[in-house]
Design a protein with these regions (language model features):
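N-terminal leader/capping segments at the start of a protein or of a new domain
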Residues: 1-47
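A short glycine-rich, His/Asp/Glu-containing loop-to-beta-strand
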Residues: 55-86
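Conserved short histidine dyad/triad with adjacent acidic residue
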Residues: 79-94, 137-139
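Glycine- and acidic-residue-biased ligand/ion/polar-headgroup-sensing regions
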Residues: 85, 96-115
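A short hydrophobic beta-strand segment most commonly corresponding to one strand
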Residues: 100-102, 149-166
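Short acidic-glycine-tyrosine-enriched beta hairpin
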Residues: 115-142
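Asparagine-centered strand-capping/turn motif at beta-strand->loop junctions
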Residues: 144-148
Length: 176
């Protein structure tokens, strides 16, 4: 029963998001509405448990699992559930599409960057935790950071499925 309810509620939420963004260029205001829709979905803790979406085993080399919950046939409006159980740090990157990250359980720090002559420079940071989220426009660089300890569960939604983002831009010490 929970699986059927989960599929229905996810479908209803993605339909609202799709309608909100239909036939217009993405803006920070639209992304803010998408973030609010996903915060509402995240409040349905009865549908998203660590039992149904477990993090990697403690002896695994992986520190996070990404579960695809929904994606349109054309690979748009891709919604994932990210679950992490260990130290996770991603280098600064630009998804080249919009992204919204919303907390369900635990804390994920998002740091934001501008390009600089020597690579990138941090300009802001926000903690994603239950009831909060961040919205990221195409062309914006960010990183995610999760500390080991308590599991973290978040929604990550993108304008295109991750497997379709062949032009993503990453910055690290080797790439200046």
């Amino acid at each position: 029963m929970a699986g059927e309810d989960r599929r229905r509620v996810i479908s209803e939420t993605v339909d609202r998001i799709r309608n909100r963004a239909a036939n217009q260029e993405m803006t920070p205001e639209i992304l803010s509405g998408i973030k609010d829709d996903l915060i509402g979905l995240a409040a349905r803790r009865d549908l998203f448990s660590l039992e149904d979406f477990p993090p990697p085993a403690t002896d695994s080399k992986r520190r996070s699992c990404l579960y695809r919950l929904s994606e349109d046939d054309d690979h748009g409006f891709a919604l994932y559930l990210n679950v992490a159980s260990g130290d996770v740090s991603a280098p600064p990157h630009d998804h080249t599409t919009w992204a919204v990250i919303v907390g369900i359980e635990g804390q994920e720090e998002n740091r934001f960057y501008n390009e600089a002559p020597e690579g990138v420079e941090q300009i802001d940071s926000k903690m994603v935790e239950p009831g909060t989220g961040v919205a990221i426009m195409p062309g914006e660089f960010h990183t995610i950071h999760i500390n080991a300890g308590k599991p973290v569960m978040n929604f990550h939604m993108y304008g295109r499925g991750l497997e379709q983002l062949h032009e993503r831009k990453f910055w690290n010490e080797r790439k200046r």
